[in-house]
Design a protein with these regions (language model features):
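Conserved ABC ATPase signature
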Residues: 134-138, 142
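Conserved catalytic motifs of ABC-family nucleotide-binding domains
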Residues: 155
Length: 258
């Protein structure tokens, strides 16, 4: 289980996370939704120790990673896999080298076993016999799947997905959604997904959490979020142009324009 308590982070005068509270149950996929610039990516970076928050706790199975030194953090990070928004493949490496990158860097297995793991993980995401292709030869959906194969290559028990369906057509987005569900069911990973794609969120989530003004303002199952009575959440999930989110933005613009 991941327990985030009182998490705060600011950049200069801008408060991004403001006493955020969130519990991520073990073996479940918690999807964090929210508008652009609301701090979703900052939350994930804090969760893996890439950003140090100003206050709060992030406990993974009871251990607070914020108070760990760098050596302890390196050990904990081995439990994480991450699918980046743009897949973040190394352009100078072929597909096989990309998937094997962490395994070789951490010297996890003998070379023969690394090759077997690469083949296995690529098969899990529906890609066979493409190890020698370069990233430039892949479609957007293939890049995402290679990125996912790399994320699971080290057998993590926690997976982080940063906007996994962004930039994909609806069919390929649904392929990625199905892979996320399959991984949760077959290897039992605990997952945090950040997205503003509500179709994806409703399909893959066990729980959905809405991030707004640096706080989680509502957590619920997909059905509970669909029928929310919170006007902020309701405006966001229904994609309405008018409501408290946009009304507040318009009021701010009028104020600074005086």
């Amino acid at each position: 289980m991941i327990a985030i308590r009182g998490l705060s982070k600011r950049f200069g005068k801008k408060v991004v996370l403001d006493g955020l509270e969130l519990t991520v149950p073990k073996g479940k996929n918690t999807v964090v939704i929210g508008g652009s610039g609301t701090g979703k990516s900052v939350l994930i970076k804090c969760a893996v120790g890439l950003l140090r928050p100003d206050a709060g706790e992030i406990r993974i199975d009871g251990q607070d990673i914020i108070r760990m030194d760098e050596r302890e953090l390196v050990r904990v990070r081995r439990r994480f896999g991450m699918l980046f928004q743009g897949a973040a493949l190394f352009d100078s490496m072929d597909v096989g080298e990309n998937v094997a990158f962490v395994l070789r860097r951490l010297k996890m297995y003998p070379e023969r076993q690394i090759r077997e793991v690469v083949e296995e993980k690529l098969s899990m995401v529906g890609l066979r016999d493409i190890q020698r292709l370069m990233p430039a030869e892949l479609s957007g959906g293939m890049k995402k799947r290679v990125g996912l194969a790399r994320a699971i290559a080290s057998e993590p028990d926690i997976l982080l997905y940063d906007e996994p369906t962004t930039g994909l057509d609806p069919i390929m987005a649904d392929v990625i959604n199905d892979l996320i569900i399959s991984l949760r069911e077959t290897i039992g990973v605990t997952s945090i997904t950040i997205t503003h794609d509500m179709a994806s969120a409703y399909k893959i989530a066990d729980h959905i959490a809405m991030l707004y003004k640096g706080k989680i303002i509502e957590v619920g199952t997909p059905d509970q979020i669909r029928t929310t009575s919170n006007p902020v959440v309701e405006q966001f999930v229904r994609g309405r142009a008018h409501g408290p989110i946009t009304d507040e933005s318009e009021e701010f613009v009028r104020f600074v324009s005086r």
